[in-house]
């Protein structure tokens, strides 16, 4: 009976947590909807008197607004990509692993599996990175998200403002969202400023639109400052080919810690996020090279790392049955979450 109550309580808490996780997104949506009303109706249609100025303001605003909302939508609803079955323990191996009481035998099982996978990063102690929650050997740059309760390929961070994990599948969209958010706030602030001054000096009649125009400038400037800092930080990460997690915790390779292990040079670093076709850089469609399981590394020469020798292997590969080249593995295995 008590166990049933505990399970019901746990289920209720999980449900409440899922509902509450959408609150930050709802706040952003409400602010954006109000900004749309304030700019389009209260500023352009009511306050601005010149027809030509109205048209120009509205066309440019909606062009930015479309890309702003499009990238936000993609950041929210593009699901995080998880490691394929090659990295998971099979049902039989999982049963053997869980039933095995000898730690050294468990370690050997995982070492044998790691030797067949393209994994080159290790834990801080030099052990193979194993997730005991998902029962898989983590691909390079993959981490377990406690909020999403899954391992996420090339995980950057979990963002409450999009209620999603930012990783390999949607990092490009998230970066674009930051860029268009900065542009959105900047455009509003610059076009509203002159009317803000007119209202402040009393050159325009004090009507209902006054509040919306004054507050619109304040909100745009406030969000612009915070967003431009965050966007600048992520631009720096992209230029170094780092994730947020790697910036705070230096990745460890088979040869030891290397903070620039994935740094391929400025242009190639950008291409690792946006792809090599510049026509897709500003559009929120998937163009990041690779499958999220393997990445070219600076610390390995072309003979050691086939991804550097053949850039064609960077292209998306959705075949979970693909045979991976054997990679070296340490003899120690340590679970990491």
From Swiss-Prot:
The DHHC domain is required for palmitoyltransferase activity. Zn(2+) 2 binds at residues 145, 148, 158, 165. Residues 327-337 have a biased composition (Polar residues). GO terms for cellular component: endoplasmic reticulum; Golgi apparatus; Golgi membrane; postsynapse; postsynaptic density. Expressed in placenta, liver, lung, kidney, heart and brain. Its EC number is 2.3.1.225, 2.3.1.-. It comes from the Eukaryota. Residues 306-337 are annotated as: Disordered. This is Palmitoyltransferase ZDHHC15. The active site is at 159 (s-palmitoyl cysteine intermediate). It is a multi-pass membrane protein. Pfam families: DHHC (PF01529). Palmitoyltransferase that catalyzes the addition of palmitate onto various protein substrates. Has no stringent fatty acid selectivity and in addition to palmitate can also transfer onto target proteins myristate from tetradecanoyl-CoA and stearate from octadecanoyl-CoA. Palmitoylates IGF2R and SORT1, promoting their partitioning to an endosomal membrane subdomain where they can interact with the retromer cargo-selective complex. Keywords: Acyltransferase, Golgi apparatus, Intellectual disability, Lipoprotein, Membrane, Metal-binding, Palmitate, Synapse, Transferase, Transmembrane, Transmembrane helix, Zinc. It comes from Homo sapiens. PANTHER family: PALMITOYLTRANSFERASE ZDHHC16.
């Amino acid at each position: 009976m008590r166990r049933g109550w505990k399970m019901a309580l746990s289920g209720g808490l999980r449900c409440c947590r899922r509902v509450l996780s959408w609150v930050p997104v709802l706040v952003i949506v409400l602010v954006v909807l109000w900004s749309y009303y304030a700019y389009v109706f209260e500023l352009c249609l009511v306050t601005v008197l010149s027809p030509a100025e109205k048209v120009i303001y509205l066309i440019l605003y909606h062009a930015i607004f479309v890309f702003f909302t499009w990238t936000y939508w993609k950041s929210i609803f593009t699901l995080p990509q998880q490691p394929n079955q090659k990295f998971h323990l099979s049902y039989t191996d999982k049963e053997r692993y869980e039933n095995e009481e000898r730690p050294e035998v468990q370690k050997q099982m995982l070492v044998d599996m790691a030797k067949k996978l393209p994994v080159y990063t290790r834990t801080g102690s030099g052990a193979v990175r194993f997730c005991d929650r998902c029962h898989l050997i983590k691909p390079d740059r993959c981490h377990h998200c406690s909020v999403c309760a899954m391992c996420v390929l090339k995980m950057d961070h979990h963002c409450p403002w999009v209620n999603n994990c930012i990783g390999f599948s949607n990092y490009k969209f998230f970066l674009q969202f930051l860029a268009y958010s900065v542009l959105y706030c900047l455009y509003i602030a610059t076009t509203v400023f002159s009317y803000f001054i007119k209202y402040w000096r009393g050159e325009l009649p004090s009507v209902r639109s006054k509040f919306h125009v004054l507050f619109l400038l304040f909100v745009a400037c406030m969000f612009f400052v915070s967003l431009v800092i965050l966007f600048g930080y992520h631009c720096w990460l992209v230029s170094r080919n780092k994730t947020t997690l790697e910036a705070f915790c230096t990745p460890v390779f088979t040869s030891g810690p290397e903070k620039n292990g994935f740094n391929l040079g400025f242009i190639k670093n950008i291409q690792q996020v946006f792809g090599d076709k510049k026509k897709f850089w500003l559009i929120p469609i998937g163009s990041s090279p690779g499958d999220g399981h393997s990445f070219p590394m600076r610390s390995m020469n072309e003979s050691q790392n086939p991804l550097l020798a053949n850039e064609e292997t960077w292209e998306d590969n959705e075949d979970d049955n693909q045979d991976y080249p054997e990679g070296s593995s340490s003899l120690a295995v340590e679970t990491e979450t």
